[in-house]
Amino acid sequence: MTTVDNRQDFKVADLSLAEFGRKEITLAEHEMPGLMSIRKEYAEAQPLAGARVTGSLHMTVQTAVLIETLVALGAEVRWASCNIFSTQDHAAAAIAVGPNGTPDNPQGVPVFAWKGETLEEYWWCTEQALTWPNTPTGGPNMILDDGGDATLLVHKGVEYEKDGKVPSVDTAESDEHRVILELLHRTITDGSQKWTQLASEIRGVTEETTTGVHRLYEMHRDGTLLFPAINVNDAVTKSKFDNKYGCRHSLIDGINRATDVLIGGKTAVVCGYGDVGKGCAESLRGQGARVIVTEIDPICALQAAMDGYQVTTLDEVIDKADIFVTTTGNKDIIMASDMAKMKHQAIVGNIGHFDNEIDMAGLAQIPGIVKDEVKPQVHTWKFPDGKVLIVLSEGRLLNLGNATGHPSFVMSNSFADQTLAQIELFTKPDEYPTDVYVLPKHLDEKVARLHLDSLGVKLTTLRPEQAAYIGVEVEGPFKSDHYRY
């Protein structure tokens, strides 16, 4: 583990990987036209000058391009990953070293991330990303979040400082909750206002994923949201591209790297048919699997049926399928009692943000069960009767734990959304009182437009009379905010 304190503070696995990481970043830049175009467009204006951005998002090669885009637009950045398994260590090393540094003289961005963190290390990294030495409040003035963990930590810190105490660790509902409480016990002392002061200067947060957006809407509904937020996840160029086409690519990449099992001819169950589920089902069918979908929503269920998938309950197929993938963003989708009914050597994985879709704690508590590591993030679980299940990434994101996540081109869409959302909140604070917003439609269309040339797309241009006929401007936006793409 490399920790260096000279010009920058950071903690990564191995700085010697920086050259490899830099080569992959250079390749990714070519595949990320949205971000590179934004760098060029805004380089002179420096719209993020003065921004202190705390990032909590998977520390991948693609994220490295995002980080260096924020820096190119004037921001200072501190970064942590948002998943214990998702960091690509060579990318983290390259960011810590920087484009002009060396492993012996790192000159990059403070990043706190490595693959295979413990929960304690993970939340320490998040705390470090939120800690800004030599600043008035000791913290950021912007957050770029994925899953909402950085936002959660700030809000819980403020809540407990207001209450005057942190709940007892004995009240923790999970191992992760216990770690969070321990961290806040350590950072909140009598009369401490660390988190309250830190939150006071935050202009806003831009949130990447469905689960984090749910948290934001819950806090706003409860009246506890401390600063404005832009829901990047529901930008069309994020949810309809990253969620669907990204998962279509990365799900089978993760399964193949983890197991080398032929997918063709297998029966695969996809739990959930939202944008992520749609991409997963399509990828599995493309490999020749017979795909079955489970759904709670009648609209999504009807979509799945009309797309040609059997839609039924998990109970109906639990003992028949070979592959199970959870995609819901909900909890307790596949329970230990379900896994006890599965076939020998069934593969179980999750592609939703958190690790609570699959009941890993319940699985571990089955009497006589034996867990064995095949290789990192691939484990067999042997039941007393000899049956074995293959569980990927310990129930966490398999596409990042077992593979490298979504490809650069699709992430260019999402990260262009993130960059424009950061500019929007940072430069227009008076236009965004505390609430949860979506990315303005003209910016959503801008992001799509930035990616067309790379694919050889030529747009038709409306004539003025045509634009007037449908009630839009010639240059757009072309759809209403409620249009469903």
UniProtKB/Swiss-Prot annotation:
Belongs to the adenosylhomocysteinase family. This is Adenosylhomocysteinase. Binds 1 NAD(+) per subunit. May play a key role in the regulation of the intracellular concentration of adenosylhomocysteine. HAMAP family: AdoHcyase. Its EC number is 3.13.2.1. Keywords: Cytoplasm, Hydrolase, NAD, One-carbon metabolism. InterPro entries: Adenosylhomocyst_ase-like_sf, Adenosylhomocysteinase-like, Ado_hCys_hydrolase_NAD-bd, NAD(P)-bd_dom_sf, S-Ado-L-homoCys_hydrolase_CS. PROSITE patterns: ADOHCYASE_1, ADOHCYASE_2. Substrate binds at residues 60, 146, 208, 238, 242. One of its GO terms (molecular function) is adenosylhomocysteinase activity. GO terms for cellular component: cytosol.
